[in-house]
Amino acid sequence: MKERLKNFHHSAVFICLVLAIVLDVILETLGRHSLFKAISYVWNQPLIFLYNCSIIFFTLTLSLLMRKRIFGYCVISFAWLILGITNCIVLGFRITPFSAIDMLMARNTITIIDKYFDVWQIVLIAALLFVALAGIIILFIKSPTVTGNIYRTRTTVFIVATFFCVMLFTRIALNAQTISDNFANLATAYNNYGFVYCFSNSVVDVGIGQPSDYSQDKMLEIKDDLDSVGTTDSTIGEDKPNVIFVQLESFMDPSYVKYLTFSENPIPNFTKLKEECTSGFLTMPAIGAGTANSEFEVLTGFNVAYFGAGEYPYKTILGKQTIESMATQLKLDGYSTHAMHNHDGTFYDRYKVYKNMGFDTFTPMEYMYNLHHTQKNWEKDDVLTGEIMKTLTFTSSRDFIFTVSVQGHGRYPSQLDEENYSYPIKVAGTGDEALDTQWTYYCNQLHEMDEFIGALTERLKKFNEPVVLVMYGDHLPGFKLTDDDVENGNLYQTEYFVWSNKDNLPVEKEDIAAYQISTKVFDMLGFEKSYVQKFQSKYKPGDDNYDDELENIEYDMLYGQRYMYPDGWPYEPTNMRYGIEKISISHVEKGVYVPPVDETAQTASGDAAAGETDTETAVAEEPQPLNGYYIHGSNFNECTFVWMDDAFLSETIYVNRSTLFLPRDDAFEAGQEISIAQVGDDSIDFGVEDTIVYGGDPVDPDVLETNVGTESVISTTEATTEKSTQKQKSGAKSKASEKTTEN
């Protein structure tokens, strides 16, 4: 027996130990993009390195319960390597390392992968994953099997003991402040404490932990203190203004980068406005990524630092939990509340989150028209001017509009497509031609975003209602910058300004945090504030117990007993609508659709015929007529699809803003329900927009629509059946119905 135990320790356990050390060196090399830096980390932080190894060692010991141990070693090692390689790739695009929350973003990431990788790179990644999967399957089949008794009970005891040892090491290291579980800066934490610990911590550290002094008495004491905080005197009089917040993607003043030179100022409008208006630096919670956390802090006044490492509350709690925000507060004051974003509405789960934050409407890209795109296929911000003005005129009440832009988003290309895009701003100074080109691309996006700022303020100057406009950058772009590279010495700082179309705001210069800006604006306008805003108004960072009390407030509202609301939690999800304009069907007609001619293919065919090659090619490339049905209505766009049998029909063809075509060989039956829905790139829909009942095909089979036809349906408003109405209200079994019935 002793000999067997000896062999057990000298073989399997030793293999786990060696593998753990080798894996951690590889993971640190990948994370630091340098073997030398990884070795330096091991040399300078030996205890932290061994602690990280102990975590890997524990995961490897799970293979000791398997008869195919080599297979177990390889699978667990492969899992760690996948995480490390992913972190390596992510750090090539942004400053923030890969964490567990990014895995919740996988669906969103797939929709934008083409903006970060070329087609051949995507194919290569897919091929490598396929080869790896095939290798795992082959390894499982071919790997040797341990024969005899593997002593499961003793092995289990050993694994459990290893787990508790790791937990003990963690507690000792935390108490000794060798490591920390409070990551103010995720990149710095990964650099100081190692990839394995930081990533593992992001898996288990989610939400806000209960503060040690949290109690009903404490929260009621805080409530009583904040109830005494009243409103401030308005700086603009009694006529309450429309309030517009615009969050500018990756927006900064590039002149702060010490080594860059420009052919001209990329952002003259922003420069002028920040000099003339209340403005300052705005400390954001992230660098190069994390848009959702920036808007979370701005909208709520909450400090995201109290949440888990790298956590996005939008993805973990706000999809199922209401929260007080600027929107909920302004609704109490009679405002209509609107959100808009010129990118996918499902990104960061905004389509779920915004209804829990008090918004009446949400207009994502799927409900916008005349979108233009950058070279990297991000939506340009020029569309937002019209959307904001449309929203302002849509309601009779005052409006709160929260806008999130996207044009400045990375990745920034090292080659410019000057044949199809204009790049008037020239940038130099990095000492690297490819990097100069990336900065040139980025600064030209800033220039176009600045033109949007100028166009919007000009339109608002002519608007007949008072408007207060707040603009700010959500975070710095994902370039490899250090604090020493920028004039202000802080990579977490962007800038903001507060402007009024009535020129009736005071001019103040103040540097604040993102979670303070809503309070600052509300104080300027004399608005009634939420509890968090009252706290931010009365206390400032650095005051005694500031962090402790703010953390208690955030915990009480989101995870605690809500002691601050003894009469009950007042916030319910809104019955949020998507878009401002009604998308509707007027009638459906049977017809024939001829797709537009592919000019490129036609030219190629003509060249082939001229060269006396296979002339059949030209015939084959002629567009073939399609039989089916025309769906007529209003406010369609490229995201509008026919919806039938609880699913959208991907074959729907967008013809123009009032016409869709559905290729279909089978005839619709008289009385059949036909619906339309808006569907995003990720195939998630936003619910049924409108439904009609088909009146039947024309009696004369020759009466088919080509350009003009005759109406042959019953309008929804005239004769939609009770069954159809109930179907829209109850929704379908798909994600669309889930969204339309969440309220």
Language-model segments: residues:
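Alpha-helix initiation and N-capping motif
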Residues: M103-A106, N192-V196, Q216-M219, I267, ...
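Short, charged/polar micro-motifs that form catalytic or ligand-binding hotspots
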Residues: N44, I48, N52, K68, ...
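Residue-level preference for non-acidic, small/hydrophobic
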Residues: T109, V243-L248
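Short alpha-helical interface patches
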Residues: R94, D102-K115, I122-V123, S200-I208, ...
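Solvent-exposed soluble domains appended to multi-pass membrane proteins
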Residues: G230-G237, L248, D253-N743
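Transmembrane and membrane-interface helices of multi-pass
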Residues: K2-Y190
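Membrane-interface segments at or immediately adjacent to transmembrane helices
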Residues: T170-F245
